[in-house]
Amino acid sequence: MPWSEVSPGHFQRPLGANEKFIKSIGDRAHPLGREHWSVTAQARFKTSDALQGGQERVPELHKAWKTMRFAHPSIASIANAETLDYYVPSPDGLEDWMQQTFFVVEEDTSSQQYIASLQPSPYLTAHYLVRTSELILHTAHWRTDGFGAMQLVNAFFEAFAGLDDRDPIDLPWGQEVARLVPSIEEVLDLPEEATPEIKAATAECMATLALTRGAVGVSYQGDLTTLPAGTHSVQGRLSQSETKAIEEACCTRGISLLSAVHASVAATTYAGASSEAKSKPYTSTMRFNLRPYVPEPYSSPAYASALYTGGYMVQVPATHSWTENVREYNSAYRRGLSKGFLRARREYALNVQELLKKNIAMDGPPPSEVDISSIDDAELLVRPVYHGKSGDVEILDVSIGVETLTRQLYCFVWTFRGQLGFNLVYNEAYYNLTTATVLLDTLKNVLLTELGIRDDRAI
């Protein structure tokens, strides 16, 4: 159902089934002051001499933030139990929203430390770290995904570089509602009632969830009673020469870079597993950006603040070699998503919601594998340089991640400015920095070694 005006300046639509099930997962951690799978996108930047730096640039950043809301109003929508609500702001309302959502951080803290302290918000929030010149966007996962979050980073810097003398208050507020995003169910024109074909496709997707049981996992701290703490991460980048060598090696072998990293993530999980677990199969997620599968204009960056993602679980046996795994992953990525998978998006989400309500306890240890998520070439999402009337804005590096409250680790991967980047996300209640660093070093070493770029296996 599309957005409708339920009272003057108040627009509303039902939460989509996928938004609702992702929201229910995130909301479970609210009593702990956290939100599972909340998305965090980062960009470190510098400006030319013509633009102000440090604390002096804050008023301009505020203007850019308000301008960005006009272009992407769904960053200010609020999710209730059954509906999404958006209110056209008055001048005072726009200022109040800015004060609630844009934060200037002057403390001497790293982005990783700061992200670990973030708490849930009804809105998408922005955080400017003055000392390191970093922008962090943080939001619940029901609002967007990794690709969309990076497109929103791009939208912010487009607004910042493109500022003029006009006050954002003077924009034609009320017209922005035409850009409120629809749900994936509406975009794909999915029926309310599932057909037999849709039910069959849903059953196939649901069946893959069982693959997480009895799978190999990384050894973790604590026991089943250990409560989660903050989310931390360890980041790394390969040099431009190493990245180029990896891309050339993948091209020669007829495989994608993502497939090679995925196989290396599997090997990393086995390396971090206990000796008793090393004979178990490895289960991970085949994640897909749905934007290439939806019609125009919904595939464009104008719909960045939308949850357009999907996936299913896959499993490889412990007896498989790296080469066998990379071939299997490459085939799956190349195959992409079927029409049946897309048509099952609503029914699948409804089925998962029902499963979550039952709160069925899993047999055996909880999943603790390293899983993978990729935004591919980040330069297709975030421009390296923005040219404006007052000067240029250069993006030095980017990163993407999520909050995790489970024993699962998530390896995010991308390329930017010719470098392959990694962000390994973990919960500090179950892993420490040393363990995470060793895992990421192992991943990089496996990737370089298996592709013949590094001859030894020393980290």
Swiss-Prot record:
Pathway entry: Secondary metabolite biosynthesis
Key words of the record: Pigment, Transferase
Disruption outcome: Produces the angular tricyclic shunt intermediates monasfluol A and monasfluol B that retain the omega-1 alcohol.
Keyword Transferase: yes
GO molecular function, one term: transferase activity
Induction details: Expression is positively regulated by the azaphilone pigments (MonAzPs) gene cluster-specific transcription regulator pigB.
SUPFAM superfamilies listed in its UniProt record: CoA-dependent acyltransferases (SSF52777)
Transmembrane segments: none
Keyword set includes Transferase: yes
EC number: 2.3.1.-
Applications: As colorants, MonAzPs are widely used in various food products for centuries. Moreover, MonAzPs also possess wide-ranging biological activities such as antibacterial activity, preventing hypertension, lowering cholesterol levels, causing hypolipidemic effects, and displaying antiobesity and antitumor activities.
Top class in the EC scheme: transferase
Database matches in InterPro entries: CAT-like_dom_sf (IPR023213)
Superkingdom: Eukaryota
Disulfide linkage: none
Function: Acetyltransferase; part of the gene cluster that mediates the biosynthesis of azaphilone pigments (MonAzPs), a complex mixture of compounds with a common azaphilone skeleton very widely used as food colorants. PigM and pigO are involved in the elimination of the omega-1 alcohol with pigM acting as an O-acetyltransferase that synthesizes the O-11 acetyl intermediate whereas pigO eliminates acetic acid to yield an intermediate with a C10(11) double bond.
Family statement: Belongs to the trichothecene O-acetyltransferase family.
Name this polypeptide is given: Acetyltransferase pigO
